[in-house]
A protein has these predicted regions:
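Switch/connector loops and helix/strand junctions flanking conserved nucleotide-binding motifs
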Residues: 44-48, 74-78, 137-141, 236-238, ...
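Hydrophobic "anchor" residues on beta-strands that sit immediately upstream
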Residues: 7-8, 36, 128, 201, ...
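Phosphate/Mg2+-binding loops and adjacent switch elements
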Residues: 90-201
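Short, well-ordered alpha-helices that flank and scaffold nucleotide-derived cofactor binding pockets
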Residues: 26, 30, 121, 219
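Walker A/P-loop NTP-binding active-site region of P-loop NTPases
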Residues: 7-69, 133, 142-149
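P-loop NTPase motor core
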Residues: 50-103
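Short, high-confidence coil segments that cap the C-terminus of an alpha-helix
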Residues: 4, 32, 125-127, 223
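C-terminal lobe/tail of nucleotide-utilizing enzymes
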Residues: 2, 52, 184, 188-269
């Protein structure tokens, strides 16, 4: 796997996490191939870089690539992938599977599952993947979904093993257990990445509500490395990374003036 670090910037809306993610991705790309991913429904990458980004991976500069994910399209692709797989293994219940696919598209965690699946694919292609996350509640749901999906595949694995016994007794080939094990392995790879190669920067400013949301991220993501960042720092003392404010941080040159060395030092230590 090419990935060295998966980096999330999370926090309350309006604290500058998108600006920081852009600046950090730009600096990391000077070292190795880097992808900046926006999963915030209110995408801001294009506005900060002053370059149209869009929902397909686009090279912005040298080794810097970016994409603004469209959650609806991701869910549709993911549902079609599931539908295709289930139809292959269970052709006799094709109509029921199509109905099931509707539930996948509209399930409460459909977006989060599709996003995680795609991010893991990106980890195979880039040394650094930097994620400009959605506001706090949505970002936390992303990580909660991982644990839920992981438990679901453990259950499916047991069901598939029982089905395999019947198919073997009937003298028929059954590839379903292998498929589920492959999906479980993909989830295990993601678990390893989250545990060993992931950093979440909980971004806040000196306003109490943003500090509370950043602390919520710290409290709830106990199995992942979380570091507090105070953006637009003025005077507050804390055990955190402090980033002073600059005016109009738009465009490549302005982003390079942002004092993000403490974040880079933390990531590359």
């Amino acid at each position: 796997m090419l990935l060295k670090r998966l980096v999330f910037f999370g926090g309350k809306g309006g604290v500058g996490k998108c600006t920081l993610s852009c600046a950090v991705a730009l600096e990391l790309s000077k070292r190795e191939k880097t992808l900046l991913v926006s999963i915030d429904p209110a995408h801001s990458l294009s506005g900060i870089f002053l370059v149209e980004v869009g929902d397909q991976i686009k090279r912005l500069k040298d080794q810097l690539f970016a994409i603004e994910m469209k959650a609806e399209a991701l869910v549709e692709d993911y549902a079609e992938k599931v539908l295709s797989t289930l139809t292959e293994f269970l052709p006799t219940v094709r109509s029921g599977i199509k109905e099931y696919a509707k539930y996948i598209r509209h399930s409460p965690t459909a977006q989060e599952t599709a996003i995680l699946d795609k991010i893991l694919d990106y980890c195979e292609e880039f040394a650094y993947v930097v994620v400009d996350s959605a506001p706090t509640g949505q970002m936390l749901r992303l990580f909660e979904t991982f644990h839920m999906v992981s438990g679901w595949f453990d259950f499916l694995s047991q069901v598939a093993k029982e089905r395999h016994k019947v198919e073997r007794f009937m003298g028929r080939e059954d590839r379903l257990p292998k498929l589920i094990e492959e999906r479980k392995q993909k989830l295990q790879n993601l678990a390893n990445i989250l545990r060993e190669r992931t950093t979440v920067f909980a971004v806040a400013n000196e306003e109490p509500l943003s500090l509370q949301e950043a602390q919520d991220i710290r409290n709830k993501l106990k199995d992942i490395e979380v570091q507090l960042v105070i953006n637009r720092w003025n005077y507050m003392e804390c055990d955190c990374i402090k980033i002073p404010e600059i005016e109009k941080p738009y465009g490549f040159e302005a982003l390079e003036r942002l004092s993000i060395k403490p974040i880079l030092d933390y990531l590359l230590r």
